[in-house]
Amino acid sequence: MGKVLEYFNCGIIGYGKIGYSIGNHLLQRGIKPTVYDINPIKQISALNRECNIDNKNNIVSNSEVLFLATGNHSLNIHDFRKIKNGSYIFSVTSSDDELDDSYLETEYTIEEIKPNIYKYYNSNNWFYLVKKGNAVNFLHNAVMDDFIYLVMSEMIVAAQLLIKSQDLHKKNNILETNESVKKKISKIWLDVFKNGKY
């Protein structure tokens, strides 16, 4: 939109790997984001990395640029009503996972003002929801490029491990790919995409 990010109040909801990465990139640009996470350990981690921390309501109502990185319905209609006029909202997961948008279309008029930038407005407030709340990190192929194959490969291997696992039917059990699997996938990726062996 032709505006300089450094002059905006930036908020991050969710401080896992992706939220941490967003915060780190903002800090490198001289922007001190304000972070909220439901996990107090993550809040301390954000504070330790020199981010501000605050509660969700304050971040939603004060941020001019808001990054959503929870994958767990971080905003609902009550939150949307509090968003500061003119704010930009970016999600890094699908809108189904990140937003409870069931009332958005009935309460707001939606207008695409530029490709993938949608203005939501009513008599109460207005804001921009980039890509209608779907992942902006997949908006341009150049961002992910061939690196997406690392993620996809690990997902396939994880699914195979889950299917083969004896622990498949145990409740409250998380299976992860181990370091050796990740190294093997990374080596194959380097051979294919960096070294051109295949």
Identify the residue ranges that each predicted region occupies.
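Glycine-rich adenosine-cofactor-binding loop
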Residues: 1-27
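Generic beta-strand/beta-sheet core signal
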Residues: 13-15, 29, 36, 54-56, ...
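Adenosine-phosphate binding glycine-rich loop
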Residues: 1-4, 100-198
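Short, glycine-/Ser/Thr-/acidic-enriched flexible segments
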Residues: 17-18, 40-41, 72-73, 94-97, ...
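NAD(P)-binding Rossmann-fold cofactor-contacting core
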Residues: 13, 28-49
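Generic hydrophobic/aromatic pocket-lining and core-packing "Φ" positions
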Residues: 22-23, 43, 80
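Hydrophobic alpha-helical scaffolding
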Residues: 12, 32-36, 53, 65, ...
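Rossmann-like adenosine-cofactor binding region
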Residues: 47-125
